[in-house]
C-alpha cells in the first residue's frame, strides 16, 4: 500500500482524512524521514493526510523539528509492528519535556503501561491520547483519570469492539493484532464506556496483504482503512461496521 492506494481506499470507505502512523520504512523519527513522507503524501494522496512522528531514543534531538511537520508524537510503550518501542525513563522524560506543548502526545500503551502514560500526563500537565484501548482495566483507569481532571483522551477500534479471544480459532492469523483481542468481558467494558470515556473510534489500519498474514511469520494487524468498517453514529450510541448497525450490548433487548 502507498499514499495513493491507501487514501483511495479511505475515500471509498467514507473517510476524508487519515492519520498515518510512524512505524514505516524509514520510521518517521527524523526530520529527513518526515520530509520524505510529507513530499510523497503531497504528490500522491487523494484525501487529507496528517502524519504522526515517532519517538526514538536515538533521535530525541529531532523532536522540535518533527513537531513542525507532524500532528502528534506517538510513543510505543509496548511491542507492536516495527521497532519503535520506548522502554526507558530518560527517553520518556525527554519526549514530554521537548515535544511542543501545543501538540498531543499519543501512546500505544497496554495494561500497566496505561498507568505510566497517565502518570506522565499528570507530572508534565500534558494531553496524552491513548490509542486502541482494548482491556477493561485500561478503560476503567482512564475513566478514573478523566474524573480527576487529567488531560487524557482515548480511542477504541472496531475489531476490539466486535471481536474477542473467542474468535481466535476461527480467524487464525487474521485475528493476530496489537493489542491482541480481549476477552468477552473486555469487549463489554469497551461498549459500556463508548458514550462517555471513549473519545473516538479509530481503525488502527495495518495494510498487510493476505499472503503476509498467511506466511510463517504473519505480522500483527488488520487492514481496516477502506472497507466501510468505520462510521460512528454518536447520537444513538451505535457503530456501523460491515456487519451493519450495531447497538451497545446493554441497549439490546
Which residues does each predicted region cover?
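Histidine/acidic residue-rich metal-binding segments in metalloenzymes
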Residues: 61-76, 81-201
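His/Asp/Glu-enriched, well-ordered alpha-helical/loop segment
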Residues: 112-115, 120-125, 196, 200, ...
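Active-site neighborhood of phospho(di)ester-bond hydrolases with catalytic His/Asp-centered motifs
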Residues: 19-22, 27, 51-53, 106-107, ...
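Hydrophobic alpha-helical scaffolding
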Residues: 23, 27, 131-132, 179-184, ...
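Residue-level signal for inorganic ion chemistry
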Residues: 10, 128, 155, 204, ...
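Catalytic-site beta-strand/loop segments enriched in glycine and acidic/polar residues
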Residues: 1
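Conserved beta-strand segments of alpha/beta enzyme cores
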Residues: 48, 151-153, 249
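Divalent-metal coordination cores built from histidine and acidic residues
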Residues: 7-102
